Design a protein with these regions (language model features):
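ATP/NTP-dependent adenylation/nucleotidyl-transfer catalytic domains that generate, transfer
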Residues: 227, 257-296, 300-616, 621-641
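Enzyme catalytic cores with a strong preference for nitrogen-chemistry domains
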Residues: 1-293, 304-320, 327-330, 334-345, ...
Length: 641
């Protein structure tokens, strides 16, 4: 079967125009022999639903558009749509075939409920509840398809025995620097998809969205993988493409002419993703130009260069702030010349002898320049600064922060990569960064780079990887510094609320892990004995009846394990016995505490909630194979119960 992937750049909610283009692409694909056309997950409606009061009107307009598509496309198509489920995105895929529309996820859910298929796969994987009941599996032209919107869906196809020939993965995550799989085909050798092909024994068709939806960036790079891991076809990143591949379920390989997977260059892809995100985010806000503050520091140089690459030098207006340092002044002027930017110079001495006040006034001048030129002011704040350096009561930075989801150490890497293309940023500017002023940070490395690397390691471990403070300190050392970093992260929360939007470049933004206002409690590094619950005694109870039930279940599990060990010993000619031990009340309480931890980590009894990490930006189920770095938590989910 020939399958076409229509990698198209769209504007979310531009329903009629997008539908017209879908019909055009379907006709073109059909002319080239395609028997199924798959459109990207974000093409029609983006990745985030509208507010509930607007849902009714949107769905009515969407229904009209879908009917039009069903009447005009010449071949079967899969058209993804988006709805709202309790405030969270609920993706769906409509199969358009012979003038009919079939909602694949809803059909799968109803079929599971009607036939009791929910328990069909129970016990086949690591979990007992089986795969998601709304996981679409359908047949078309003699080929059996599975459809996945998330990594959780892919995990279900990996873990359970589905009779599918092809798995269609419709990417809805967006690019993230900490997840190679998010770059789709360009990183196929570094991501999870080759493992998915091997685990499922099916062809994997990755359908990449393209463009910027909200502040999430999608890079395209759709691909087709064979069950044995060869790359059969791939679309370019950051470009529209109609990818058509011949998928043969009967073929056992190898391909006559497979493609060689690219070597994944994360900084290069990230730079291009940020440039695309900046261009399209400004366009969505009604701007085509930007104003930047250039003072010779690392972040200001990176933002000015990124804006120039994204918008062109005639659309970037530079406010050159001088007087801080002669070397930085020289570097800032040289950067503006290299980028050919129009410049307005602002001496700090003319503002105020107070450095902090002068910096605030410079920000006000940047906003005035932007207003005068009809441009959007850009903030130079990176993710490290937003996490640790925006203090309550300080003047908020106006405008979009292109690097607001990129750690400072990663900015150094991005600038190094950009200079290999053309060396526009001076050595002085590349080293003009500050390490956040955290007590004891001097002990965490011999150089500013190594100390900054430690700070960003702690932040990423906590934010992106969701690791407890004690785990981070166990692996990286310096527990007091780790505690101070995370305390500062929480303390800066009120100031972050007044900062502008960022371009999403990670699997979790600072907004996804916002600290509750007014929460005075702070975590601290704890010993293994503390984390195991020693010393709790009998102070925690769920009620005598439940305590006894849990204790009895634990004893039964222990007796089963002991009987198994004894039988093994007897088979080996050895005498085995299980010594009787007195009831350990403290151990019972630790078991109860561990049970509470399990419910905390898994969302309690909310069985309909997906596993893995999930923030506002839909990054559930990450990462792929490999797990978290230094995954040494003794609180692994259901590890003790």
């Amino acid at each position: 079967m020939k399958i076409a992937v229509a990698q198209m750049r769209t504007t979310a909610g531009e329903l009629e125009r997008t539908a017209e283009r879908m019909v055009e692409l379907a006709k073109k694909a059909a002319d080239e022999g395609a028997q199924l056309v798959v459109f990207p997950a974000a093409a029609l409606m983006g990745v985030w639903p509208v507010d509930p009061p607007s849902q009714e009107g949107l769905l009515l307009d969407l229904a009209e558009v879908l009917v039009k598509i069903s009447e005009e496309v010449p071949c079967p198509c899969i058209v993804p749509v988006l709805s709202d489920a309790d405030g969270a995105p609920a993706p769906e895929a409509m199969l358009v075939h012979d003038g009919e529309l079939t909602p694949l996820k809803l059909s799968a859910l109803l079929r599971s409920s009607a036939t009791g298929q929910t328990d069909k796969h129970a016990g086949e994987g690591l979990e007992e509840d089986g795969p998601a009941p709304d996981l679409p599996v359908f047949e078309l032209g003699g080929v059996h398809f599975g459809l996945a919107f998330s990594f959780d869906d892919l995990n279900d196809f990996d873990d359970y025995d589905f009779d599918v020939d092809v798995v269609l993965y419709l990417d809805g995550y967006g690019f993230a620097m900490d997840d190679p799989s998010s770059a789709m085909g360009v990183s196929v050798s570094d991501g999870r998809f080759m493992d998915d092909a091997e685990a499922t024994g099916a062809w994997i068709v990755g359908v990449g969205s393209l463009g910027t939806y909200g502040t999430q960036v999608f890079t395209g790079s759709s691909f087709v993988l064979t069950p044995w891991g060869e790359l059969a076809a791939q679309s370019p990143s950051f470009e529209e493409d109609l990818l058509i591949a011949d998928v043969d379920p009967e073929l056992n390989g190898p391909l006559d002419h497979p493609l060689n997977p690219e070597v994944y260059d994360c900084p290069l892809v990230a730079w291009n993703a940020l440039a695309q995100g900046l261009t399209e985010s400004l366009s969505q806000m009604g701007f085509t130009q930007a104003a930047v503050l250039v003072d010779g520091t690392l972040d200001s140089s990176a933002v000015a260069t990124l804006a120039t690459d994204a918008l062109g030098p005639t659309n970037v207006h530079a406010l050159l702030v001088t007087g801080i340092d002669d070397k930085l002044d020289s570097s800032a002027r040289r950067l503006a010349e290299n980028l050919r930017l129009p410049v307005r110079e602002l001496p700090m001495a003319a503002l105020s002898p107070d450095h902090a006040l002068a910096a605030d006034l410079a920000q006000a001048h940047l906003v005035a320049l932007a207003r005068e030129e009809g441009a959007m002011p850009l903030s130079n704040l990176d993710k490290t600064a937003l996490a640790l350096e925006v203090l309550p009561g300080s003047m908020p930075r106006a405008g979009l922060a292109p690097l607001g989801d990129v750690y400072r150490y990663a900015v150094i890497e991005l600038v190094h990569m950009r200079n290999t293309i053309s060396p526009v940023i001076s050595r002085t500017s590349r080293h003009a960064f500050e390490v956040p002023a955290i007590p004891g940070i001097e002990e965490c490395g011999p150089t500013p780079e190594s100390r900054l690397d430690f700070v960003d390691y702690v932040l990423a471990s906590h934010i992106e990887w969701g690791r407890p403070l004690s785990d981070i300190a166990d692996d990286g050392g310096h527990p007091q510094v780790v505690s101070a970093i995370l305390d500062r992260l929480a303390s800066c929360e009120p100031a972050r609320m007044s900062c502008g939007p960022v371009i999403v470049a990670s699997s979790r933004t600072l907004e996804d892990v916002a600290w509750p206002l007014g929460m005075m409690w702070r975590d601290r590094a704890r010993t293994k004995a503390e984390r195991a619950g020693e010393g709790i005694g009998g102070t925690i109870s769920l009620g005598d009846d439940l305590d006894e039930a849990i204790a009895q279940a634990a004893e039964e599990l222990g007796s089963v394990a002991g009987s198994h060990d004894a039988s093994k010993g007897q088979q080996g000619g050895e005498e085995a016995s299980v010594p009787a031990t007195p009831r350990d009340r403290e151990k019972d309480m630790r078991d109860i505490l561990n049970l509470l931890r399990d419910f905390s980590l898994t969302g309690g009894l909310a069985a309909d909630q997906p596993e893995g990490r999930s923030g506002r930006h839909g990054q559930g189920g990450r990462p792929g194979p490999g797990g978290t770095p230094g995954d040494s938590s003794i609180w692994r989910t259901f590890s003790e119960n």
